[in-house]
Amino acid sequence: MSRRRLLVAALLASAATATACASSPSSVSPGPGGDQASLAKLIVTADLRPCPASSTTVVAGGLPNVTLPCLGNGPAVHMAGLTGEPTVVNIWGSWCPPCQAEMAYLSRAADADRGRVRFLGVDTVDEADSALDFDAHVTPPVHFPSVFDVDRKVLLDAHLPPSPPVTLLVSAAGKVVHTEHGAYTSTAQLQAQIATYLHVSA
């Protein structure tokens, strides 16, 4: 490839990730963060719904074959085994400004579609205490569950850009039917995609 083509490719790659967080900040270290007593209090305050049950099934064209611990209460989740109902999987971090900006829209959509669409967050390269505190202070507060992904396993195994936010819409059969790169700008935008790709209307 010529030098000119390499330059164009680099510019296009840069533009594609303009709405994502370029990397995790050096001040955030992977791991649970804080002591267990403080973490237990934050779990109660955040009041997240339990993480969903999952099977050991691996669906072709589905989520990565990784198992991640629940951020709050509930079982570890085998991501490739999330079947049975349409699911919105949002990859986020409390340290990520675009993630912070869109989370209220996700929270509203999750509340509006509860019982029809499952929402699951994937908190990536974060500290559990920071993530739980963030969820509790979003307006409206986030109550849908998240799993804890300190090593970006979902992003890396799905060959996605290494920086959140990224949202995956997953059919009831477990197949990824849409990938949204960057932050949502309204609840309506997300609900329109849910209607289009998951066939669930608000």
Where are these regions (language model features)?
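Extracytoplasmic
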Residues: G61-L63, L82-G84, R114, P141, ...
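Short active-site neighborhood of thiol/selenol oxidoreductases, capturing the structured segment around
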Residues: V77-Q100, L106, F119
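A short beta-strand-turn-helix
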Residues: V58-A60, N65-T87
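Structural microenvironment flanking redox-active thiols in thiol-disulfide oxidoreductases
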Residues: Q100-T139, V150-D157
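Hydrophobic alpha-helical membrane segments, chiefly transmembrane helices and signal peptide h-regions
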Residues: A9-A20, T87-N90, Y105-A109, D113, ...
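Short, ordered coil/turn segments that flank beta-strands lining enzyme active or ligand-binding pockets
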Residues: T19, L71-N73, A172
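Thiol/disulfide oxidoreductase modules built on the thioredoxin-like
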Residues: A136-H143, F148-A202
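N-terminal targeting signals for export/organelle localization
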Residues: M1-P69, A202
